Amino acid sequence: MNKVYDWFEERLEVQAIADDISSKYVPPHVNIFYCFGGLVLTCFLIQVATGFAMTFYYRPSVVDAFASVEYIMTSVNFGWLIRSIHRWSASMMVLMMVLHVFRVYLTGGFKKPRELTWVTGVTLSVVTVSFGVTGYSLPWDQVGFWACKIVTGVPAAVPIVGEPLVLILRGGESVGQSTLTRFYSAHTFVLPLAAAVLMLTHFLMIRKQGISGPL
């Protein structure tokens, strides 16, 4: 075992990396309320794992979507548990995100020199809510269909660009297969990729600047 470790140490300087991570200064005022951001990341990883598992059975079709979700819940081994964990962790992710934003705001963590960290965090909040909006409609039941119709119709109230935005979101004049395909693509590829990039940027900034001091 030591030989394996020494082999990696010689090439990657693993110990130096470990020392850098473990020796980072943590201010004495940090408490449990500073863990909300890490819990958001934990929920995101759970979402990725459970969501990936369901992609093997889910069919993004207006004809088959509901039946495929029903199949996951009733016929796939532990499918009901995987989908339930996905739903619960989604709700928990939104809750932890809201608490994290409030904690950062109330403790002044958005002030100079951490303005860009705050901007990436707020952008991540928008991405998190977008996860909920797109995922809610994927079962394509009555609730999902009408939620999709209402959400995609909201931009119509915006002058000039409203109607084109509605067409882009729906993929046509009305809600249908193109809309479901867009929501599925956004939920399983576009938003996870955006979240991963933003989280990495967010954490690197925190790593560089450290945790903000007390008020």
Swiss-Prot record:
The keyword Electron transport applies. Binds 2 heme b groups non-covalently with two histidine residues as axial ligands. Pfam families: Cytochrome_B (PF00033). It is found in: Plastid, Chloroplast thylakoid membrane. Its main location: plastid. Heme b 2 binds at H86, H187. GO terms for biological process: photosynthesis; respiratory electron transport chain. Its cofactor is heme b; heme c. The 4 large subunits of the cytochrome b6-f complex are cytochrome b6, subunit IV (17 kDa polypeptide, PetD), cytochrome f and the Rieske protein, while the 4 small subunits are PetG, PetL, PetM and PetN. The complex functions as a dimer. Belongs to the cytochrome b family. PetB subfamily. This is Cytochrome b6. The lineage of its organism: Eukaryota, Sar, Stramenopiles, Ochrophyta, Bacillariophyta.
